[in-house]
Amino acid sequence: MTTYPIVQATKPLNWQAIAQIAVHDNGEPLLVLSLCSRIQLIPTYFNQHISGAINALVLRQTVAKKLQHAATLLPDTLGLVVFDGWRPLCVQQALRDEIRQQIVAKHPKADEVWIEARLDEFVANPNRHDMCPPHLTGGSVDVSLFHRATGEVLDMGSAFDEAGHLSYTAALENETDARLDAARQHRRILVGAMVQAGFTNIPTEWWHFDFGNQNWAYFSGADRAIYGAAHWQD
């Protein structure tokens, strides 16, 4: 059985530090991802009827190429399923509101400061004036794995967009429950391929990867971001 490197915990997500990184947008265009045998497309927020979500998955040109490369680094039986890419501010706000409801439902006695801190772990604040949300740049992509023979999306140990500790990318490395063994392996495969293709991952979401934006610069050590806010027109 092939073994894959464990998922190492990265430095903590720090929006204040990320916001300080300079942006020199290179003007690279957005493009619509195309379906292929190694990449499955599920425009999740459009399917959930979130107002403003588009029926397409859109990324910067280089990000799309790197995603295609990442798919070739997977075992032959697996492919990448893409849930989201470029995202307008109205959808970002809708998602922040939805995640807030999840957190409040689980922690009804929590105060506002604690809730906001938890929110920042799982969804960027669209109302910040010192930076744009990563998905608005076209440099962020949300992905998982699927089995090419069946089309089945693989178990990753927590659901996409689930706001909880098991969604932390490295969380399963410390879990002893045998039921999570397969999911742990799946995360190792996903993270390994995406990082090898040039992406960085935020530590609070196993599904979220970046290239070219401030998140990527922060986690990769680059001195600047090459993608700022991008705008899409059908």
Put a short name on every predicted segment.
Residues 1-85, 89-203, 216-234:
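Extracytoplasmic cell-surface/polysaccharide-interacting catalytic and binding patches
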Residues 209:
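Conserved metal-phosphate-binding beta-hairpin within the catalytic cores
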